[in-house]
Amino acid sequence: MTNELNSLDIKEIMDLLPHRYPFLLVDRVLDYVPGKRLHGIKNISFNEPQFTGHFPDTPIYPGVMILESLAQATGVLAFATYGKPAVNELYFLASMDKVRFRRPVIPGDVLDLEVIYLKDRRGMGKFECVAKVDGQVACEAMIMCARREI
């Protein structure tokens, strides 16, 4: 039995995801098990454009950006499991349920992204997702994504 981790650097993530700056929101994958789970990170930097208006005197990383980071992490796991979508396919966010924000995320934080693949049915993937900072839950959600022909 081996203890090797399946990790992905930013170039490998960019090969899997279509997102680019300023909307590529997964910086590194520390470990993943295809079809099971993924642990990635998003580094929160004050240089990100959303901090100019959210909020100027008290910068807080927007909750929708945390959710997008989690959604992108589901994409990385799905693509690492089943391969990238074909040219005529699109993978997109379908729904979010049980969304809870537990603590603010601020510049300098490292957002730990934890995604568990629950099931896939007819191209709809369901994931249990948690974003943490220093071991504390910042956000949790059930996310569904769809893979469809366009």
UniProtKB/Swiss-Prot annotation:
Enzyme active site: H54
Tell me its EC number(s), please.
4.2.1.59
Cellular component terms per the entry's GO annotation: cytoplasm; membrane
Q: Where in the cell is it found?
A: Cytoplasm
Which Pfam families does the entry link to? FabA
Which Gene Ontology terms describe the biological processes this protein takes part in? fatty acid biosynthetic process; lipid A biosynthetic process
Similarity comment text for this entry: Belongs to the thioester dehydratase family. FabZ subfamily.
Q: What does this protein do?
A: Involved in unsaturated fatty acids biosynthesis. Catalyzes the dehydration of short chain beta-hydroxyacyl-ACPs and long chain saturated and unsaturated beta-hydroxyacyl-ACPs.
Protein name stated in the entry: 3-hydroxyacyl-[acyl-carrier-protein] dehydratase FabZ
